Amino acid sequence: MLIEDAVSSGTPQFVIDSYATLAERAKTQSFGLIEEDVIVLDTETTGLSVQDNELIEISAARLSGREIVDRFDTFVHPKQLIPAEITELTSITNADVADAPSAVEAVAALADFVGGCPVIAHNATFDRSFIESVKGGVNVSDIWIDSLALSRIALPRLASHKLSFMADLFGCDSVSHRANADVDALCGVWRVLLVALTDLPQGLMARLADMHPDVPWSYRPIFSFLAGQNPGSIFSLSAARADVLKADRADDRVDADELPVLKMPSREEIEADYAPGGLVNRMYPTYEPRDEQIAMALEVRDALVTGTHRVIEAGTGVGKSMAYLVPFAEAARRNNITVGIATKSNNLADQLMYHELPKLAEQLDGGLSFCALKGYDHYPCLRKLERMSRGQVEITTKRDPADTLTAVAVIMAYVCQSADGDLDSLGIRRRSVNRPDFTTASRECARRLCPFFPDKCLVHGARRRAAHADVVVTNHSLLFRNVAAEGRILPPIRHWVIDEAHSIEREARRQWARVVSADESRVLFERLGGSSTGALSQVSRDLATSEGSTLYLGLTAKATSTVARASMAIADVFDGVRELGRRARGGYDNANLWIGPELRESDDWHDFLQSAYAAIDALEQADKSVDALVQAVAADKPEVVVDLGDISRRLHELAENLKLIIDGTDEHYVYSLQVNRRLRAGGESMTAERIDIGEALATEWLPEVHTAIFASATMTVSKSFEHFNHAVGLDRIGASTSSSLHLDSSYDFDSNMAVVVAGDIPDPRDRESYLTALERVLVDAHLAMGGSVLTLFTNRRDMEDLYARVEPKMARAGLELNCQQRNSSPRRLRDRFISEPTSSLFALKAFWEGFDASGETLRCVIIPKLPFSSPTDPLSCERNLREDRAWARYSLPEAVLEVKQAAGRLIRSSTDCGVLILADPRLVTKGYGKKFLTSLPTSSYQRIESAQIGHYLQLWRARHERRR
């Protein structure tokens, strides 16, 4: 494998050249004491969980310089049988371990071999946790070095840091999923990592070695030794950023506002791009032209030419991303402008950035420049990073400080070898570090007070590069944050594709919400601190010996006092919110209470107002005193109060949001409060949400945009775009400025998808009868399908009750049924569902859309209850107060679209087939039921008595298996 193919896109040439010589230099370079008497170790186990699995093999090698001078290898006899998949992966059989020593015996022998020397392992936490779970395992070594984390520091631009990838790349022994072979591979990679560390900017090793010396950190001796090889070297992050940015130059782009009309390919040229042998065919040799895709591409082209908007519902299989990419890329290239694509999901953004756009760039003469742009909190803040590395700020005590130092080292190395990039690609686990320690927000950014602003900064550098790119890929969240920030986040982009557009109203409402949160308030006051902690304490220490310190310290003392009062006052507010939450009806875990006329006129609310007004006054006093301190110090020492100024703005925002909600007279908003019933304290919040998102988009965003292409597979209700057009404001800007287009899927839904309506299920309001009948449907369906069933619930209570009833019956039948329990990871549930073809899943909202499991993995989707919003939902209550037919205008079409999204989980390729079971009797008993059925991708459905559903599914399954 060539180094060029092994590094991330955009890696500077000097980094590629350095990586290319590592293997050769590792053969001759010496590192003295740090490679004497070190142990390289690997284990094999019966699985990934230390609670449920056991060791089956341990291998270790003692290194002296470049030589292995001693070895330790043993099988381990587990108490459980080795699973077949582990035997297939490792070739270790139950016969191999039958006469092996027990785990206690093997680990004791390992401890004797190691003798307390440092241990190197790839993903050392895994190996260490298994070894130390055995009696005596803690005696093996006190020093464990994770070569996975070290490789991210030494080689930050590698596309992968898997041991097998690096071993192959640098010509080391191959990985074979056997402990002894993997140890040999790591012995070779270890020396490569040491050489790579010496290639990082001079002085960086010393900076890392000296970082927070009071924190025990296994990498410190390595960095300290390497720093000693270049004594006196001074590290400059600013200089390192300047070096890496030397070759990062781009042409300026034109603001499309300056162009009277766009130069675009003709319709015939667009059609040729999608014809056999055309542009798209060159990108994908197996591509076959689709009439629906060509029609969409032409519609997008016409919208760009005329400067108008389009709403395009493109069914599954149309290939909508390639339909808009080609005309949008041509618009950017021919007019020297930047165009934008906003997606909801990371999956689609990654598909565009790492697959479709690179392939398109390869086939276009002159190429195509593109970049991804994310929110501020995805990028390292270099000012914070610099202060952290110099020990000028405290490490968050709630996390392992060693993990924080490792994260600082990884980020430092990355920004020294990367012109741009974000935290998401660095393998830093969110649960291991406090991300706000390394990131900033738009309202917190120091901008001109920051030594890295603008060009050396990753946030503003990304924005600058976006302004020079042909295509910018971002997400709905950032797009709407940019609208709220009046365009200060994104470059001026006048032509947009809003993909996955069915969810943008909800996302805009979320992004524009004004929230007063107990958890965020607690974090804010922790950051402010007081006499001994936080930003106020830091300012006191920084100013203690300054000229004028008496004045400054007096202002600091006043600010500390008012902040303490404000902290107590806002805590009283959240106590009151929790009491008000007792009035909420419904909600299993969370109470969501509308702050409507009835509540505002109650005695409870009037009692609550006393603490609310007191908090507003205390917050305003704290805001004034902190701002006075910031203004006084900023005149002479602005760098001292940068962080405090950031926090002060948050304090002001908290006061303003609380005033807005308590006052409640701004009719643009609906007001509500939230309480987590499972917690005795914490989790309380108050929220003001925009009611009419369409009005806001029509006045604040669409006038700034020449062309917006709204695309999704789920937009119409009974073939009508009326609901969507109202939701995004297109019905407020004139009929001539936009048009809609429906494109049928290229898949044969009528043949491959069956829809079953259970016609005799009791009304859900008769809960026990309903659950009993639904239990029978679920059991029969799972048994008939043999697994591969996804059941989508609207509330946790029903899901957990039915899981308790159904799961034991599935277990007795040898079928696996999982449930989206509290705090469970949706990603892990998804991966488990996909990896086990016969498993089934009970799930909530996270799985109603965006969950793809093609083929035999998913053959049946069951929707027990139509997903109407709760009658007590604050937005629904506010709409009902203002409009007579609000339920039919909003709640009904929103539920129809959610069912369409859920149905879309079934058919993800032309060969997929499956059954959708709708078990809500209202589809039959209510007139609105037809809206759901006529909106589905197949026009045919069958009404079947619930007792016959299992038999029907058996026949359906047999018929489709014969077809294959």
Locations of regions flagged by a protein language model:
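A substrate-engagement module of RecA-like helicase motors
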Residues: 250-251, 256-257, 270-278, 336-338, ...
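Conserved pre-motif I regulatory segment
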Residues: 264-312
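Signature of the SF2 helicase/ATPase Hel1-core->accessory helical subdomain module
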Residues: 350, 442-443, 447-471, 475-614, ...
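Acidic two-metal-ion nuclease catalytic site recognized across multiple nuclease folds
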Residues: 2-30, 191-267
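Conserved RecA-like P-loop NTPase helicase motor core
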Residues: 746, 758-769, 821-924
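Conserved non-catalytic scaffold segment of RNase H-like nuclease domains
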Residues: 2-143, 156-177
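Acidic, Mg2+-coordinating catalytic module of metal-dependent nucleases/exonucleases
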Residues: 115-135, 156-229
